[in-house]
């Protein structure tokens, strides 16, 4: 498990929640992995109580499952939840990128350009683990530009399930066409071309639907039946 330092003024519960969630999404903690409050508390250097609170919070998001007498496990990936997350993203991302075409300014373009340029740099250097966070930041920036940041926060919990498949897609299928997708989306926004931008979003999201079949054939143990 990858463990980062606590942020200034970050309480123990939020620290445990952040570390656990990041490791689940990055697949450092693989689906089906048994987790122990005692071991996690020792690794994080905190007491069991904040770890327990973090586990409860992640259980509400269906990322951890706890069973009496059996313990807690990282949830297997649920294809139904992934598809529902993709459904919501298709609707909201399409509407939001069209709004971003109207709202875009030089500052917004600079933010998106810096992000995509970094993605392309890391891809060229084989540092693909760096792309995950930049991917999230890219899409969040589009919501911010469209002035729909609250919408992004509201659906972020369900998106966690989509994000696990997204990260597994890159790790398993080795398909980095998503970086080119981001470049093309940026250029459509720059041109204020709503039709092309919306089409690119749908193509981008459909890419993971195609990948899922390949992923499940290679990692069937990660998925619910």
What are the language-model segments listed below?
Residues 67-68, 169, 176:
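Small-residue-rich midsections of specific transmembrane alpha-helices
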Residues 101-102, 147, 171-172:
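Short helix-capping/hinge motifs at transmembrane helix termini and TM-loop junctions
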Residues 1-102, 213-225:
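Short linear motifs at protein or domain termini
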């Amino acid at each position: 498990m990858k463990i980062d330092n606590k942020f200034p003024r970050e309480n123990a519960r939020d620290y445990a929640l952040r570390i656990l969630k990041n490791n689940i999404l990055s697949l450092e903690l693989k689906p089906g992995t048994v987790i122990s409050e005692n071991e996690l508390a020792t690794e994080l250097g905190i007491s069991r109580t904040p770890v327990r609170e973090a586990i409860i919070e992640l259980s509400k998001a269906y990322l951890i499952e706890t069973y009496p007498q059996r313990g807690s496990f990282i949830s297997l990936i649920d294809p139904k939840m992934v598809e529902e997350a993709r459904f919501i993203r298709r609707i909201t991302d399409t509407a939001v990128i069209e709004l971003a075409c109207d709202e875009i300014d030089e500052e917004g373009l600079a933010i998106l350009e810096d992000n995509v340029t970094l993605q392309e740099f890391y891809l060229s250097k084989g540092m693909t683990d760096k792309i995950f966070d930049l991917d999230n930041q890219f899409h969040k920036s589009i919501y911010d530009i469209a002035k729909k940041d609250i919408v992004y926060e509201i659906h972020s919990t369900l998106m966690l399930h989509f994000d696990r498949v997204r990260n597994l897609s890159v790790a398993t299928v080795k398909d980095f066409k998503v970086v080119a997708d981001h470049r093309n989306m940026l250029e459509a926004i720059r041109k204020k071309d709503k039709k092309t931008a919306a089409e690119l979003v749908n193509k981008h999201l459909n890419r993971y639907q195609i990948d899922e079949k390949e992923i499940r054939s290679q990692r069937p143990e990660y998925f619910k039946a």
